[in-house]
Amino acid sequence: MTSYTPTYRIKVAGQTVTGATLSGLTITSGRNDIYTQPSAGYCNLTLIETALSSVDYEINDAVSIEVTNSSGVYVYLFGGFITDISITVATSSTNVITQRINIIATGALARLARAIYTGNLSSDFDGDQIDFIISQLLFDKWNELSSSLTWNTYDATTQWQNAENNGVGEIDTPGDYQLDSQNNLNGSIYSIASQLATSGLGYLYEDSQGLIGYADSTHRSEYLSQNGYVDLSGNDAIGPNLQIQKKSGDVRNSITIAYGSAGNSTVSSSDATSIGLYGSLASTITTTLKNQSDAQDQADYYLDIRAFPQYALPRVTFQLQSPEIDNTDRNALLGVFMGMPVNLSNMPSNMNGGEFQGFVEGWTWTASMNRLQLDLIMSPVAYSLQAFRWTSVPAAETWNTISPTLEWLNATIVA
């Protein structure tokens, strides 16, 4: 049994909000499934104001939401920029007026959607192309700096590579796939970067501070092999909201990959067994892959992991103030991120054998003064990693080459 009461810290334009009281908070991040690139994070925040203090917030002001963890240390839940502000009289009397200040903010990916890139892209790996394209917006150019800026007033601890960085986070460079060159581009930076990420079998994301990152095709498997799963118990989740789901819409048994600068070349792969069971469920994925061999590898990869349906976990809910959640699990949940590997045990035995292993795709925080709820959306591990089938293991493999401490649940990621 552990005691936990969340304490929140809200900053607007770098200044901590001190007078108003948090009334309600909803934060949504990530995506609903593995098939699309994520949209911008969304924050809906309500403050209660009783002193008629001046409200100096402005559109595009930076906003961050933090909460204390089990050790009392503040950790980030959200970072973004204000898009809407409203002030409403909630109650009034002769002596007291109570107001609701509602702030809506979006994450940094929204900035990519409203910025246009015109120009060319030279052939390069996926991570390098994405790093280039988003840096056009999120790094200030030399002539964009204030003319009154002087060297002795600049932060002396800033590294040159991150100077004037307005939102670029961790980008996996160079990436795993060589992409073709593109000429005469004219579109939103978000749509261009999303296409590049899909071409590289990766995804864009926002971290908890609002920085934009890119995870390449091997990011999840590398993280899992180095850090393992976050182990959580279904006993700590809210039972009525725990759900697993298997859908025919998740099956892909005939894959066509379009590749090249204009997507005019194609390769295909299909699974006769899956087609015999479920009928032909075809999908065409347009990429800018440069090499035919990479396109064929991707077609085979999609087929390996999606020819047969797997249970996903579209919702599981945790109340972080619950004394049943220990401090280790609570802190892990507070650090949730897109691609976090989770092993959820102690589920009902008729739900996927009582255990689910997956990656977090999206999440929603719902908060009030003394309450903090987290809803997770998870995809099965098999949709992100190429799990070996027994017959696919090399014939020359011997038992004494496998780590004696390897657990069966982790064997799917060991070649």
Give the location of each predicted region:
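Beta-strand-rich assembly/attachment modules of structural machines
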Residues: 1-128, 366, 371, 377-385
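Generic structural motif
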Residues: 6-10, 20-27, 63-65, 159-174, ...
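Acidic, small/polar-enriched beta strand-loop surface segments
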Residues: 1-18, 120-127, 191-357, 365-370, ...
